């Protein structure tokens, strides 16, 4: 994950995974001093003062940049932690939903098996009840009893 940061007039790209170490162990105040390989002549005191002021300004910008970069890195770390927490919650919720779906599917399968078993039995029972009702009605029908006795 890379981000752009502006510190004064310096625009830098910082890799946030390595950025914290780079910022914390980066340039020190002595890193901007003049090296011994410069020519043996020294600039005039006025020029030297201007250079020192510029170096001090750059060092302030560097410190400001370090603070901003560390703040941005901490913010990104916090955001990442929050996103990880939310992701874990969503994964748990998805697992619960999948479990409920499996349970519903299992109940549906059982329900279908029960219905497959009971529906033909219900039809048989209805037919049997109908026959019994018809027999009962015939046995209690007085006209039928009279006709039966006349036939004898």
Swiss-Prot record:
Top-level lineage group: Eukaryota
UniProt organism field: Mus musculus (Mouse)
Lineage of the species this protein comes from: Eukaryota, Metazoa, Chordata, Craniata, Vertebrata
Coiled coil: 46-109
Protein's name in the database: Coiled-coil domain-containing protein 182
InterPro entries (alphabetical): DUF4715
Keywords noted in UniProt: Coiled coil
Example of a GO biological process term: female gonad development
PANTHER family, per the entry: COILED-COIL DOMAIN-CONTAINING PROTEIN 182
Pfam family, one: DUF4715
Keyword Acetylation: no
């Amino acid at each position: 994950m890379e981000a752009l940061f502006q510190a004064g007039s310096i625009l830098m790209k910082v890799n946030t995974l390595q950025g914290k170490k780079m910022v914390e162990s980066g340039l020190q105040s002595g890193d901007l001093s003049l090296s011994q390989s410069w020519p043996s002549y020294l600039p005039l005191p006025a020029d030297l003062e201007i250079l020192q002021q510029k170096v001090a300004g750059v060092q302030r910008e560097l410190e400001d940049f370090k603070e901003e970069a560390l703040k941005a890195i901490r913010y990104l770390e916090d955001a990442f932690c929050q996103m990880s927490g939310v992701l874990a919650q969503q994964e748990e919720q998805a697992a619960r939903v999948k479990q409920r779906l499996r349970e519903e599917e299992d109940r549906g399968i059982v329900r279908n098996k029960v219905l497959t078993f009971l529906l033909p039995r219900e039809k048989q029972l209805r037919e049997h009840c109908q026959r019994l009702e018809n027999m009962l009605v015939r046995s209690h029908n007085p006209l039928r009893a009279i006709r039966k006795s006349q036939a004898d």
